[in-house]
Design a protein with these regions (language model features):
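C-terminal ends and interior cores of transmembrane alpha-helices
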Residues: 67, 114-133, 337-353
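Extracellular/periplasmic helix-loop-helix junction of adjacent transmembrane segments
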Residues: 58-91, 138
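Extracytoplasmic gate region of multi-pass secondary transporters
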Residues: 55, 262-312, 405-409
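Helix-to-loop junctions at the C-terminal end of transmembrane segments
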Residues: 93-105, 316-328
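Glycine-rich segments within core transmembrane alpha-helices of 12-TM secondary carriers
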Residues: 173-197, 220, 394-408
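C-terminal transmembrane helical hairpin of 12-TM major facilitator-type secondary transporters
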Residues: 329-376
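Hydrophobic core of transmembrane alpha-helices in multi-pass small-molecule transporters
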Residues: 132-152, 356-371
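Cytoplasmic membrane-interface "Motif A"-like loop-to-helix N-cap segments
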Residues: 102-114, 325-337
Length: 496
């Protein structure tokens, strides 16, 4: 196998150690890295602020937009609208991913921020069902579609952006800040809803109080847009783009993406499945499960979830450090095993009716989730090569979230209603854990290694020189995968 040119159309950079030169090693700009992490995490926080608010207001939203004599039916209708946004996420990934691979990660992430803020802000302006009838849920549905389309390019782009800006040694730590933003967004959303429940009467919440969290998205979006517009493009993309422009006709199209990288796409979908089923089960579905299924006071359930997330935030950063030191595989495999062993006991604790035992059950699930949230943002981008990273990650991530993660609240609520078994969420988590364990059989350890398709990334010139003198690998794979027969021009033309 020969070394590739500096920017192979399908695989990006690939060289063997004996041909590597010190000036080819990326030296990361630390101040720019911090700004990149902050801007990416803020965008993710805003996305999950909205999802958290919607999940914690599901009962209220059901009453405002879906009048019914059955409270459970209202919650299911609200979660159905919540789920619709996930159905359009793959379309967003299909559009924004190739754009990010061709024109740059920074430009696309700025645009997704605008759309996300507009979609969330507009929800706060929609009149209730009693005022405009059927148009209320229709407008809510349209706003959720805008949100879903924009978020289709958000996580894949943000994870790619942080991964490509980070050094190889601390990519896990830097990536963990992305999910720190997720938890921060959830806490901000849940905290706002909880404060509103405590300060306002039920009538005030139904009348206007529920609108406040959505209207906050406007100024948050402007702040996020400003931060992202001040960023530079990632070093990995700049290095590839300069050479790729000389061979425009060689850019891999979507057909080649699925043919060459199909296995990694499936692996990514499996990892995202177990990650997001756990995420949405705990952070989005549990508040409604506690109040509707278990008859627990709504404000108390929200408060317990907030406390769990507050504990998870610093642990997420610690988990990022561990993923760099111990590896991504031990973290993810350990979390899957924990779900298999603890899911049923945790749900029994949650259903006990005792505040302390409920918190213990939720916290144990939160600890398993931390192992995912701290390691996935560095694991998923490392599955793919630089020329297709944004496209592949966005498509695989959003298809998996749409089919499995985002549907978790709706499917679980429906199954609990149909079966009458309060342990259904535990069985659901155990099934996801099995899929996660099987998927990990096909995942290589990437901690401390360069991203596929990118040269090694270090913190200073001294580290670059030391890398050349060491025996440390400079690529994840010893060889590149073989290219299929791409005689069909549709397979080699640009994706967009």
């Amino acid at each position: 196998m020969q070394d590739t040119p500096d920017a192979h159309a399908h695989f990006g950079w690939f060289k063997r150690r004996r041909h590597l030169k010190v000036d080819e090693i990326t030296v990361v700009d630390k101040p720019m890295l911090k700004r990149a992490v902050g801007a990416a995490a803020l965008g993710n926080a805003m996305e999950w602020f909205d999802f958290g608010v919607y999940g914690y207001l599901a009962v209220t939203i059901g009453q405002v937009f879906f009048p019914s004599s059955n409270p459970t039916a209202q919650v299911i209708a609200a979660f159905a609208t919540f789920t619709v946004a996930f159905l359009v996420r793959p379309l967003g990934g299909l559009v924004f991913g190739p754009l990010g691979d061709r024109y740059g990660r920074q430009k696309v992430l700025a645009f997704t921020m605008i759309l996300m803020a507009l979609g969330t802000f507009s929800i706060g302006l929609i009149p209730a069902y009693e005022r405009i009838g059927i148009w209320a849920p229709v407008l809510l549905l349209l706003a959720r579609v805008v949100q879903g389309f924009s978020t289709g390019g958000e996580y894949g782009g943000a994870a790619t952006f942080i991964a490509e800006y980070s050094t190889d040694r601390n990519r896990g730590l830097m990536g963990s800040w992305l999910e720190f933003g997720t938890l921060g967004g959830y806490i901000a959303g849940a905290g706002t809803v909880t404060a509103l429940h405590m300060l306002l009467s039920s009538e005030q919440m139904l009348d206007w109080g529920w609108r406040i969290p959505f209207l906050v998205a406007g100024p948050l979006g402007l702040l996020g847009l400003y931060m992202r517009m001040k960023l530079e493009e990632t070093p990995a993309f700049r290095a590839f783009a300069e050479e790729a422009e000389k061979r425009e006709h060689d850019r891999p199209g979507l057909g080649a993406l699925f043919q060459v990288h199909g296995r990694q796409l499936l692996v990514c979908m499996g990892l995202v499945l177990v990650f997001n089923v756990t995420d949405y089960m705990l952070l989005t579905y549990m508040p409604s499960y506690l109040s509707v299924t278990m008859g627990y006071a709504e404000s108390k359930g929200l408060l317990l979830i907030i406390i769990v997330m507050l504990v998870m935030m610093p642990l997420n950063i610690v988990g990022g450090v561990f993923s760099d030191k111990l590896g991504r595989r031990p973290m993810i495999i350990g979390a899957c095993i924990a779900l298999l062993v603890l899911a049923v006991p945790c749900l029994l604790l949650v259903g006990s009716g005792n505040d302390g035992l409920i918190f213990l059950g939720l916290m144990l699930l939160g600890l398993a989730l931390v192992c995912f949230t701290s390691s996935m943002p560095s694991t998923l981008p490392a599955l793919f090569y630089t020329p297709v990273r944004y496209s592949a990650l966005s498509i695989a991530f959003n298809v998996s979230v749409s089919l499995f993660g985002g549907t978790t609240p709706l499917v679980t609520a429906w199954l609990v209603e149909r079966t009458g078994d309060p342990l259904v969420p535990a069985y659901y988590l155990m099934g996801a854990a099995v899929i996660g364990l099987v998927t990990m059989l096909f995942v290589k350890e990437t901690a401390g290694l360069p991203l596929r398709g990118s040269p090694p990334a270090v913190g200073c010139r001294k580290e670059a020189a030391a890398l050349l003198m060491s025996d440390a690998p400079v690529t994840v794979d010893p060889d590149l995968p073989p290219l299929p027969d791409v005689a069909d021009p549709e397979q080699v033309k640009p994706a967009l």
